[in-house]
Structure formats: structure tokens, C-alpha cells
């Protein structure tokens, strides 16, 4: 019988080349980096995770993120450990330290997916993240595809960029990203006015669904990450609820099928 996966999203560093306007890491008064664990402690966490997966009778899967995980001094030793124990992993990072040689190294160590962010069209994205970030991200999609790592594009939806995302998904498809998905922005205390209203968000889902239908045969998988997709599709008659009063349709999977570790 095939086991289900238990996933860990592992923040191994705060170090980053960007200062995204919606980033929670630098949202407070303290702009310094949090201390990083050394390789010995990272190994301890890794083996504890493997033991947990064994207890739960599930297969381990890890998404390594930050900051930019490629900036951690021990990242390559950590990824080599994943390979030694045959644990598949994804990188959630930036384009700036990614090149053909790095991509090949990641592939050899077992990297399945490399996720980068696009938070609007060029002007908006570079305003949110960093000048030059938009072009750098698009250019690295090809680098990943060439070595056989799935290129994933993720978007954070806010009032700043919501009108551009239906166009942005077309850009991601044109550049042959292997997947595209988005999440709602969770504002910090100083940025509540950037939160999208429920009616705006429902209209946005409608526009995105129309785009997904038009582009469904272009080779990009559209990840319906937001829990509200099920309600949206149910209202359109495209999602059926089983007749079972004990069935839980959706909700937070934390501790059930995934955990997040800040280290």
C-alpha cells in the first residue's frame, strides 16, 4: 500500500536579496537577521522529522525556504543529506543565485521543484520586491526547465496587484512555467488597507477561473491552493460534496499532513 506524504516547510534562513513589502520577516522594528542553526542542529531536526514520518507511517517530503535558502552557508551539506536518505525536496527561493550550474547541482541532489514569486507585472512586481526581479525570475524559468526541475510560480494577491494577476498568469504560461498558484495576502498591522475585500476576491476568483479554463492545455498546472476554491467551484456546480455527515471537506492540514519549522 502506497504511503501518503508528510511535508515539512523548513525556513532555514532569513537572509535574502529582496525586501518585499509584504514580507513578515522584516515587518517589525527589528530588521536584523534571526540566528541560523548550524549543520549539526539542522541534522538533528532532519532526523527528528524522519522519525516522526516513520511513526505516522508516511513518506517525508521537504520544502526548503527562507529568506533565500541558497544563502545559508550549510545548504549544500543539508541537501546532500536529503539525497543520502532519499528524501525529495523543493526549493522556495529567489532567482538571483540560480544559474545553470546551481540548477544542475540541485537536480543531482533530488530537487523536484523550484518555486519563485511573481507579484504582478514588471513595474508592480519590481516595486514590491526589487528592481530587476521580474526579468530575473522569468529568465530562470527556462534554466530550471532545461535541467528537469519543475519551475513553479507563486503569487501573493493584494489590492496592489489584484487587477494584474489575470494577465500575469498568461505571462507565466508563455514562459512555460510548470505550475502557477496564488495565496491571499495576510497584512501586517501597518498594512491593513492592502487587504482585498470578500466581494473583490470572489470576482477575482471568477476572472482567474476563466483564465485557467482558456489556458488549461498550455502545459502549466494551475494550483488551486486557496481553500475558497472549493466553495467557488461548489457554487458553479463543479465540486460535489459526498453524502457523509462525518466527512471533513477541507481545512488546515497542519500536524496532519504538514508542519512548518522556523530555524
Feature locations, PLM:
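Conserved alpha-helical substructure of the radical SAM core
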Residues: 1-112
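Conserved radical SAM core fold
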Residues: 30, 69-71, 95-100, 114-131, ...
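A short alpha-helix capping/helix-coil boundary motif
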Residues: 55-59, 80-84, 118-121, 146-150, ...
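Hydrophobic faces of well-ordered beta-strands that scaffold small-molecule active sites
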Residues: 6-8, 60-64, 89-91, 114-116, ...
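Conserved residues at the C-terminal ends of beta-strands
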Residues: 26, 65, 117, 183, ...
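Glycine-centered loop/turn positions within well-structured domains
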Residues: 18, 123, 151
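Radical SAM enzyme [4Fe-4S]-AdoMet core and its adjacent flexible, acidic
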Residues: 32, 128-263
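Glycine-enriched alpha-helix->loop->beta-strand junction motifs that scaffold or abut catalytic
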Residues: 109-113, 175-178
